[in-house]
Amino acid sequence: MAVFYFKVLNSILYIIILSDIISFLKRYVFIFRMEVFMALILPKGYDQVLSVRETQEAIKYIRDTFQKEFGKEMNLERVSAPLFVSKSSGLNDNLNGVERPVSFDILGIPNEEYEVVQSLAKWKRMALGEYNFAPGEGLYTNMNAIRRDEELDNLHSCYVDQWDWEKVIRKEDRNIKTLEDTVKTIFKVIKHMEHEVWYKYPQAVKHLPDDIFFITSEELRQMYPDKTPKERENLITKEHGCVFVEKIGGALGDGKPHDGRAPDYDDWELNGDILFWFENLDCALEISSMGIRVDEAAMESQLKAANAEDRKNLPFHKSLLAGELPYTIGGGIGQSRLCMLLLNKAHVGEVQSSVWPADMIEACKKNKMILL
């Protein structure tokens, strides 16, 4: 009889211990899920202002109007661009070097792998050469990409839509003045778009600063040595409203880069990001990443610094190192990011149709952020 009671007692203790373990695991999983989901910001008192249909109408208006004015101010022609390129061409953008492109094969073209573009940085430069564009002339295109490894939040989507642009310059124009003059032109077009949107949607438009402030990533590091690069960007952009952070990719005084950049398109000494302060999310909003592209010497040194000298054997890199490609300046301007900025939206999913975690969609809906 004692043995029976002992077994019952053991069973009860086992159930209690198992229950405690399950409770602990549930709590741990919940905490982990919350940490992953903490990237979502839900602004207090947020109101979408425009209905979904009004938002769709405004998106079309901004995109149609901006690309016409942008092309005119920058002397750029609209061209068609690929959705995917062959892996062996070396034309795809490696971004920070760790993002996995979406790849596939094609039944009618055996022994070749294709990748959905992550950007058109290298393709545009090759196209300018093939289409015989002269210095001062350029192109822009609608670029649609899938970035499967993006961390999804208010600003980041796995679907990327941007105006990719590129312009031929002379070798002697590869300098800071050319870069900053181009940045000022882009800022002027964006600022003018604020007025265009205000005429049609005065209740929704965000008011932008009148000027853009220039600073190098090293100057920014020295200004805020104890902050992370992202914290530095937030502090300087909040102070000035709109900032162009220059020289991104190379090691700074502390031995670390401000941010990652592929070694084979931007010259790390002649590039940067355009940032606007965005009150809805209390952070800097990157609208454009751009730069003067590598020449032969910059390509050599940056490939070496990135331990990527094996890329020299790819067709694009061979052509560039042989001096067969034009010198260029180029970049991308986020279409959804620009709509988000001008319409004062709190989530990029309010201005583009993409995919999101179900609990993010529900949380946004409860806070009047309707994802398309």
Locations of regions flagged by a protein language model:
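Short, positively charged and aromatic/hydrophobic N-terminal segments
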Residues: 12, 16-17, 21, 31
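A generic secondary-structure signal for well-formed alpha-helical elements
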Residues: 70-77, 186-197, 346
